[in-house]
Amino acid sequence: MTNILFAHKETKGFEKQMIYKVINSNIKHFPFPHFETEEFLPKEIIEKVIAFWPSSNEFISNLESGSIVNVDLNKAHQASFRYQINLTTKEELARISGENFIFWDYFTKLLTSPEVIVSFLNIFSKSIMSRLGLKDFNSLFDNYNIMPKLQLLHDRTNYFLGPHTDNPGKLVVFLIYFDSDEDSGKSNPMGTSVYVPVKEGFKCEKGVHHKHDDFFKVFSATFKKNNIFSFCRTNNSFHGVEKVQERPIERKLLQYSIYYGLKNKS
């Protein structure tokens, strides 16, 4: 990886630090495989994440980006309060200008290195093999294309997400928390919440959003700088974001999703 920020050896060291954090994380298996780990990114990287955060006009809303479909395109929809830059799409990454672009281009290449991607999948290998009916972990790469997607997110004011299992094309999701209002810890949970359906055994294959009233919240991740919350996508991986009622709140984070698609071997 060629860059003007860090030497090759430093970059490889950053990869190893992240892999160490992920592989040694303690997975909780109920109600679906997930974990939370502190201080995920190397110190040198998280400092630059904050220093080189893109300007507001370089983000676009979920509705404008096309990330949300089958909804009325109105500003009252919750997706209007989530702004994003898809770092793995050249056109969106190019919205970032100057020195900021240099860093985020480096950051994207760092987090999508083959070793990092394999570690992100390996931690959930048993669940992935069970879901896809694979005999061993290597079969995943033999039979499927693996596609990482990194979305830099800025949630504002009234943003919330109802319980959902997520896009069925995803294998795993990693949420890296960067920054929020200084006193957010005094209010409602800011991190992603885990839910169990009131209706015993209820599952959802499509990943549509459901009402909070139909679920019990059993856990909320701590929204703290450099915390990572991750889960393996299943038909009961219900998660969401609680709406903060007391005052306007902002959150800055990265959503790292790994998608899969069957290889065409013809």
Q: Model regions: which residues?
A:
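Fe(II)/2-oxoglutarate
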Residues: M1-F30, S266
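Residue-level marker of intrinsically disordered, low-complexity segments enriched
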Residues: T2, G66-V69, E242, Y256
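Short linear sequence elements within intrinsically disordered, low-complexity coil regions
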Residues: T11, F40, I45, N86-T88, ...
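Non-heme Fe(II)/2-oxoglutarate
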Residues: N24-F124
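Catalytic core of non-heme Fe(II) oxygenases with the double-stranded beta-helix
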Residues: N100-K265
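Short, flexible segments with low predicted structural confidence
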Residues: Q17-K21, E91-E92, N138-L140
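Short, functionally important structural connectors and interaction interfaces within domains
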Residues: F14, N24-I27, F32, L153, ...
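Short, mixed-charge, low-aromatic patches
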Residues: T2-K9, N74-Q78, M129-G133, K211-D213
